[in-house]
Amino acid sequence: MYDYIKGTVTTITPEYIVVEAGQIGYQIITGNPFSFQRLEGTEAQVFLYQHVREDNISLFGFQTTEERYLFKKLLSVSGIGPKSALAIIASGDVVPLISAIESEDDVYLTKFPSVGKKTARQIILDLKGKLADVVASEIVYVAPENDMVAGLSPQLEEAVLALEALGYSTRELKKVIPKLSKEEDLTSDAYIKLALQLMTK
């Protein structure tokens, strides 16, 4: 199993890039190969996912570990294959995607190739509440304009603002904040996970 490759980006096509490392050219399928254009001819690090079938071994490439994590989560959904998962990731911004999953916005999800109403509902069913790791690393936190987070620890404040950005209502958050406040010394990521568990019970 490969984790990443470091080498020179030598070729960019509409479907894949080629990275040369150790005098071997690796063909790597990516959601948006042309996003690597600025790296052509230079050394780049590409995070990998190796997909093995009876008749084929493919390498899928990502610019961040968060993209790869989400790709693997999408693969766990019934009806989503590697190419469909990659097409979803290729939108380039994972935050609206995660927000749609958390808010059960199946209309937003059906805009992606090969995702119909049934598949969109399956994505929500399988992944809602399970993407806190990506949320914690991708969301840019904004200073609050209300008193909902007043008096909270910095870690809990970050978690609450992240959940608010994902579309959770003030009412939903106020229900779980007292329970979260009882848990001390948690990271923002841990608070997000706990909050999602409480709200999905």
From Swiss-Prot:
GO function terms (MF aspect): ATP binding; four-way junction DNA binding; four-way junction helicase activity
Region described as Domain III: spans on this chain: 153-201
Region named Domain II: 64-142
Flexible linker: annotated segments: 143-153
GO biological process: DNA recombination; DNA repair
Ranges for region Domain I: 1-63
Main location: cytoplasm
GO CC terms: cytoplasm; Holliday junction helicase complex; Holliday junction resolvase complex
Keyword Ligase included in the entry's annotation: no
Localisation per UniProt entry: Cytoplasm
Record-linked Pfam families: HHH_5 (PF14520), RuvA_C (PF07499), RuvA_N (PF01330)
Keywords: Cytoplasm, DNA damage, DNA recombination, DNA repair, DNA-binding
Record's protein name: Holliday junction branch migration complex subunit RuvA
Organism: Listeria monocytogenes serotype 4b (strain CLIP80459)
Gene: ruvA
